[in-house]
Design a protein with these regions (language model features):
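Ligand-binding loop in jelly-roll beta-barrel domains
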Residues: 92-115
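Hydrophobic alpha-helical transmembrane segments of multi-pass integral membrane proteins
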Residues: 3, 39-40, 46-47, 99-104
Length: 115
């Protein structure tokens, strides 16, 4: 989505409003918004959005399912018992989606959204 395109979803779908149990604000200023993302074993987030591009740093991976428009788009493979290191990836803005943790361990990430 480009800057010229309007964000089509309401602010109420923002992760902090729509999925507060799994998204906690760590810091926000005029340049970034940093979220602590935790999805407990067996939990499913409510549907939500992320309007800004971001860097996602996963330090506690788990087996998850990623859904968009009610359809399963991705299922993470089983992880080794010990997953060394932090996984870092670029994320474009995300429309309505939710994540289900199907693992026996929690999922944890820090998401740095760029303004």
């Amino acid at each position: 989505m480009t800057a010229e395109q309007a964000w089509p979803w309401p602010q109420t779908m923002d992760a902090l409003q729509a999925a507060p149990a799994s998204h906690r604000l760590l810091i926000e200023n005029d340049r970034v918004r940093v979220l602590d993302v935790v999805i407990e074993p067996g939990a499913s987030e409510p549907e939500h959005t992320h309007q800004a591009p971001s860097v996602m740093m996963v330090d506690e991976p788990a087996r998850i399912r990623y859904y968009q428009a009610g359809m399963l788009l991705f299922e993470a493979p089983a992880r080794p018992e010990q997953s060394p290191g932090v996984r870092i990836r670029w994320m474009e803005p995300e429309g309505p989606h939710y994540v289900e943790n199907i693992d026996q361990r929690r999922y944890h990430a820090i998401r740095i959204e760029l303004k």
